[in-house]
Amino acid sequence: MRAVLLAAATAVVASLAGAVPPHKPKTNHPILGTWIFAVPETDCEETYYMRQDGTTLVTSGAEVAESVYEIDDEPTAKGFYRNTDRIVKDNGKPDCGGGITKIGTQVTNYIRFHPSWNMMIICRDESLDACFGPLYRLGGESS
């Protein structure tokens, strides 16, 4: 019985550890806040709540998802911030594109901010060849 309880406790701790980002963004990171993306040629909008604790809340169409993320403190020589994001919760409903995101999905993107810090684009790599956006800042972290 004791071995079963120990195994169960270990499993719970391991699952919780997976939800904690290894590196939280610095307190004045430009990613922090609420960002809006109007999906082209649709009436659909995505909202990204980028929190100081390294978690996000994203709404896209009927989808509501939560993730953990890590973003570089400083941009690369090319001006991009490397961002890794992993889905930890999802309501299983379709996003603006009709897709359903699976829990555990992880992506790495490269973010480039406008000099005003109020707009950004999200790119597949450190170039402007495959990006989406712009996303517009709505307010601070708590909004």
Q: What residue ranges belong to the model's regions?
A:
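Positively charged n-region of N-terminal signal peptides that target proteins for export
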Residues: 1-4
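Bacterial N-terminal signal peptides
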Residues: 7-15
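N-terminal helix-cap/turn-to-beta initiation motif at the start of protein domains
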Residues: 20-36
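N-terminal secretory signal peptides
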Residues: 31-65
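Contiguous, well-ordered beta-strand patches that form the walls/edges
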Residues: 40-43, 60-126
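Short amphipathic beta-strand/extended segments with alternating polar/hydrophobic composition
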Residues: 48, 66-71, 132-138
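Secreted/processed peptides and extracellular or luminal domains of membrane proteins
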Residues: 50, 102-103, 129, 137
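Short, solvent-exposed mixed-charge patches
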Residues: 140-143
